Every structure is written in C-alpha cells, then in structure tokens.
C-alpha cells in the first residue's frame, strides 16, 4: 500500500534537502537522484534558488516535501522504490526541479522528494490545490498507477485528507 503526503516548504529548502540526502539513510547516497538539478543537497538548493530568482518568485512557498511510503509486506527492492519515486516526479512534475531520496533505515522503505515550487519552463509556481492536475489527489493517482505497475498494493477508495473543512 503506497501512501503519499505533500506539504509546502517555506523560507528555505536546504534543511529538508540535507535531511533527505543523509548518507546513513540512503545507502551512502546511492539512493539519491536529482531531476532537472543536482542530487547534492547544497548544489540543488543553489540551483533551485537561482530558478526562483530567474523568474523573480519571492512568494512564501519555496518548495514542497513529498513523502511516498511503501507497505513493508510488499516485495520491493531499494532500487525499485527509488525508481518509483523518480517516475512519479517525471510523470507528474516533469518541468520542476526535484531531489528524490529513498530511505532504507526503517522497516518500511520510503521516498522523500523535495520539489522546487517553480516550473523551469514557464516560471509559474506549482498550483497548490487538492484537485488540480498538480494537486495532491493527482499525486496519489500517479503514485498508485506506478505502484500497480510494480505489482504493489494500493489503498482502495481512501479519500485525500484535507486539513481544511467547510
């Protein structure tokens, strides 16, 4: 059962990038990849900052922290989990900078993804809404599609959790 979560980052992505790329959690850094940026935390941070400055984006949201967790009963190698994280970013956020890191230090394998908030082609910020094509509901849909391709279990009919209520 693949579970996804996404939250906005404010001020700086660096702290999150340093955490997710920790060599003690990522098989010595072998399970860290950069998409449209360096896999190195400091370099990726600088590249993301440069992209924000290029498009003069000064908003509060600097990026997003995406968490993708897999059921410990699923037969999944570290490399396959990492491939799923990379493929999720490539399908859903192809024009964004991201660092994908697979953590293997716990009983359950999980991915952390730091995604820059700025589209490298348009300069527009990611649309942070539940139902938009870049939104959390589509994150789950794409993650579930890829998980099924790898023969993993997915949650059935679980609505997205929205902390805001009417």
Predicted regions and their residues:
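N-terminal nicking endonuclease/strand-transfer module with a His-rich metal-binding environment
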Residues: 1-166
